[in-house]
Regions:
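Beta-sheet entry/capping signal
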Residues: 52, 90-95, 112-114, 133
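Acidic/polar loop patches that form or flank catalytic/metal-binding clefts of enzymes
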Residues: 1-3, 89-91, 151-152, 181
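Short acidic/His/Gly/Ser-rich catalytic and metal-binding motifs that mark active-site loops
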Residues: 103-106, 151-153
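Zinc-dependent metallopeptidase catalytic helix centered on the HExxH motif
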Residues: 113-181
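Aromatic-lined, polymer-binding surfaces characteristic
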Residues: 104-111, 170
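Short, solvent-exposed turn/loop segments enriched in Gly/Ser/Thr/Pro and often Arg
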Residues: 90-101, 146-148
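Non-catalytic architectural context of zinc metalloproteases
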Residues: 1-89, 102-105, 132
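Short, flexible loop/turn elements at secondary-structure junctions
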Residues: 57-61, 96-100, 117-121, 162
Length: 181
């Protein structure tokens, strides 16, 4: 499994269980979890604020990530560092579900992103060209949309409605920066 949440210490006495350290409701809601039988984790950057790629797939063959793709993702992290100048997260995890059985989409979080893409996205370059730009888009959202939010999209609690008058601006900028990276 993978998530932005930190495991609690000490480890649970029951094998196969996980406990997480206490967090605020806001952090909990903003921390999706990815798990699966066919699972792989790759380091994209091992700095003090690391970036990790966590992948769950319908089939084990989909986890054979092409070295060129790993290199491109590592370059994405380096280029984002150059663009933004710092990392405002403790660590970041790309949570990627490779499946042709679920709806494909991306969802930003502050210290992770949930990315559902076609099962062959990492093994077929043509499919990857279509599917994988969502990773750059969601990574940019960590800065543009989570760390800094447009007026009206930052609310004091989950009961207050968001006003998305400027949503098109921040989504457009995020899309542009994702393509640049």
């Amino acid at each position: 499994f993978a998530t932005a949440l930190e495991a609690a210490a000490p480890a649970p006495a029951v094998p196969g269980t996980v406990r997480f350290a206490p967090v605020s409701l806001t952090t909990l809601v903003d921390s999706p979890l990815l798990a699966g039988r066919n699972f792989q984790r790759l380091s994209l950057d091992e700095s003090p604020r690391p970036v990790v790629l966590a992948v769950a797939a319908d089939g084990a063959a989909a986890l054979q990530i092409r070295p060129e793709t790993v290199k491109q993702l590592r370059n994405l992290v380096r280029e984002a560092d150059a663009l933004f100048g710092s990392r405002q997260f403790r660590r970041y995890t790309f949570l990627v579900a490779l499946s042709d059985q679920v709806t494909q989409f991306g969802l930003e979080s502050h210290e992770s992103s949930e990315n559902r893409v076609a099962e062959s996205s990492f093994t077929n370059p043509a499919v990857g060209m279509l599917e994988l730009p969502v990773l750059a888009h969601e990574y940019v959202h960590s800065w543009n949309g989570k760390y800094r939010r447009p007026d009206g999209l930052a609310t004091p609690d989950f009961q207050a409605p968001m006003r998305g008058d400027l949503l098109w601006v921040y989504e457009g900028l995020t899309q542009y920066l994702g393509q640049v990276l």
